[in-house]
Amino acid sequence: MIKYLLPLVITISMIQGSENKKLAQTGFQFLSVMSDARSGGMADAMTTIHGKSVSLFFNPAGMSRQTQLFDMNFSANSWIAGIKHDAFSLSVSPNNGQFGVFGLSLLNVDYGELQGTMVWDNDQGYLDTEKFYPSALAIGLGYGRALSESFSVGGQVKKAYQYLGHNVVPVTDSSKVVENNISDALAFDFGTIFMTDWHGFTFGMSVRNFSDETQYAYDGFQLPLTFRIGGSIDLLSFIPTGSEKQSLLFAIDALHPRSYPERVNLGFEYSFMSIGYMRLGYLYNYDERGLTYGAGFKIGPLSIDYALTPFGVFDSVNRISIGISR
């Protein structure tokens, strides 16, 4: 047990002792926002939670333990400042996973309506132009496979796009051209999961948004590269009897992001008869977020989940997810 927990203890100790603040170091920050409601209720501590298509957004290795032919999930996330994130994931396990699990992920972002302006020789120094609608999109293809009863690996390649409207650029004193502000990037995610024999304790790691530097206009920037290491265990497995119809899952993730100081996510999920679920989480070392709450239910192949995250000076974030597995 000590050899399994030691990496987590070392990582958390490093996080608590870190004083180097990293802020605003990356672009395409929408890739760091998680929309799944189950994960939202558990403070996004999902590195070692496996068996669903949403693993594509956390750790692609999690798909490898899928027991159904396919799993599909749609999530709607009412983010801060009127920004809306919609996510879709699909994973297919042909021939009972003999050939691994194949996955597809989509992430769409609507930044809402913004007022365009342009430089002008008047008292204000600018003129209002037409309104514009910034957006972002990411499409990914993933693969996960269980190499043994305990060890799983997975990866994903994805293409991300961001549209920030257009602007008028003077060419000469009498002529101008319109330029669309569009940028794109190719990124990779990969990870591993290892399941132990000790009460089903699971630990794993993932690397998300690994890519080359991306160019926008004249400046280059990096994507929000994030390294995660985490563990999870059913706390009720320590009770010898009476826990067959219920579970209390505890999960912890330690994050090393390029854009922010190191962070820790803690999550709990209580399940009764694999039908009703209650969730609670805590986000450590975040400026505006702390506790997270969630609930859900599952009837046959259908599951519905909801999560609420208070966001300090902003309105609370609401997420809802609908999943189907067969």
Q: What do these predicted ranges mean?
A:
Residues 1-29:
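Cleavable N-terminal export/targeting peptides
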